[in-house]
Amino acid sequence: MGYTVSSLAELGEGHGFRKVRAALGVTAFGVNAIVFPPRYEGPNHFHDSQDELYFVHRGTATFTVDGDERVVEAGGLVHVESTTHRQITNRTADALVILVVGGKDGYVERDGHLVDPEVDLPRRQGLA
C-alpha cells in the first residue's frame, strides 16, 4: 500500500511516546509524537547526525536550545541541528503534544544521547 492513515489516539493513550514511524511504516525519516504531562521537564539531549523538526500540536512548549529559552505555542515549529543540545519542558497545567520529525541523509536509526545521564535518564524514562 502506498499510504497509511492513523491518529495519535490510535497510537496510544496517556503521556509518553507515540511510535508514528513504526505504526505507519515510515522508512525515509524518523517521526514520533510525544505527549508531555503537565509540568514535565524533558531530557536534555542531542544527536550524532539527525536533525530534528518539532511541531507543537497542542499546548505550550518551552524549548531550551544551547541555553537559549524559547516559548512556542501550538502551531509553532522549531528546527534543531543534530549536535545542538535541546530540552523541552511543559510548564503548564495542560498536556503538551509535539510531533518530532528527524533525519539526515536518509538515516533514521536511533542516535540520541543524554547530556547528563544521571539527571536525564529518569526524565526520559518518565516518558516511557
Over which residues does each language-model region extend?
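Short acidic-glycine-tyrosine-enriched beta hairpin
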Residues: 67-83
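Short histidine-centered beta-strand/loop micro-motifs
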Residues: 22, 42-48, 89-91
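Short strand-coil-strand connectors
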Residues: 27, 64-68
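Ligand-binding loop in jelly-roll beta-barrel domains
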Residues: 62, 82-108
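Well-ordered beta-strand scaffold positions
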Residues: 34, 60, 68-70
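A short, N-terminal "cap"/entry segment at the start of jelly-roll beta-barrel domains
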Residues: 1-29, 43, 109-128
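Conserved short histidine dyad/triad with adjacent acidic residue
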Residues: 17, 32-47
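Glycine- and acidic-residue-biased ligand/ion/polar-headgroup-sensing regions
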Residues: 49-51, 56-61
